[in-house]
């Protein structure tokens, strides 16, 4: 609340014989008390802070109250006696009452609640209008606040999320947890709805996948079991008890009949839903299987491992096809690009190795990538990949030639899993913070192909925030303001030209 603690008085006291300082202070206190009573709000400090000091209406023939109180130079001791002090008090009372009335009407329109105090706990910015603001920065902030959502809100669980998987046909995402449960959420831009929670395994559920028709869930666990569960009835359809001798780390669905599993000791097994036992198994590495992959023909099954090998199995012949030279780093993830002609593998040193399809003995190209380990990779288009890892950032890169396109999204902690929906427009990621975030990546459809000799700034590319990122580039934030300023300048220039032209016309 603003108070006037000291009044400036002229040197000649005869001009204000009828004015008592104590009386003026008393009247001001009465006015402020009336404003407090009229506000009818429990949060008086909030209202008065927003109301500020009363500003009387300016008249051409009178001196404003602010000038008469706080400005020494505006007082003329030789001026004629007037009722300026009395009029000052009257105008202050009128202005204070008017502001309090407008404040009361605004509270009534907003439900008599300050922003953010509603039942939902989130601020209501519907009454904000950027057209009413004169400050360009404030207008830009209001526009950003009122921007409609393009992706679902985040999902947060109490338990650690080990893996996520999108449903192939419906807007449903499955979340596997460290306690062995699977949570099914129906997602949407406005809200996410928990459909059901299924208790599947006794130990950590390490991987979850949907069958191609979306009717069943396949899960593998640290308890060495593989389970096939009906998504609607939550009933167990098939149990592969003790499917491996070691904890199972990864599984991959090949088609409606076949799926593969890999464990912590490097064993890979191929399964048929119609049989009880595995079709075949091979052990060619000594460390954890980190990912498995096939192309559309399903003739070759590729597996990366933590001991630095890329191993390829011939599914039809049920034997080893080829194994790469050993790398002094973990091979964590991979993806197929360029019309199934290129295989790209991400490593624990942040590198990206490229292989020509069918020639998996040694890479044909290497891109340094980022300095942090790459543990996850998702193909977005035939030429664009999203990679993530321990630094908490999801980055997009162009494949052949390699280019960093920018940051798609970010987490506060290392990212654990990554998946994209069937339409290719929505990317989901989970982190060690037990949260799942969604990123709309539809804008990648408009990205053109990059030429080998095209100039670029690698430093800026790594730090550039793409439209889906929660962080905004400073240049993007002020871009609209600069554009509006340029438009205003052009309009002024046009008006000046028109005026000059009219002056030249005789």
Curated annotation (Swiss-Prot):
InterPro entries: WD40/YVTN_repeat-like_dom_sf, WD40_repeat_CS, WD40_repeat_dom_sf, WD40_rpt, WDR55_POC1. Transmembrane segments: none annotated. Pfam families: WDR55 (PF24796). Belongs to the WD repeat WDR55 family. Keywords: Repeat, WD repeat. WD repeats lie at residues 156-195, 200-239, 243-281, 284-323, 326-365, 410-449. Residues 1-20, 33-87, 100-132, 480-506 are annotated as: Disordered. It comes from Drosophila mojavensis (Fruit fly). Residues 61-74, 493-506 have a biased composition (Low complexity). Residues 33-48, 78-87 have a biased composition (Acidic residues). This is WD repeat-containing protein 55 homolog. Signal peptide: none annotated. It comes from the Eukaryota. Residues 1-11 have a biased composition (Basic and acidic residues).
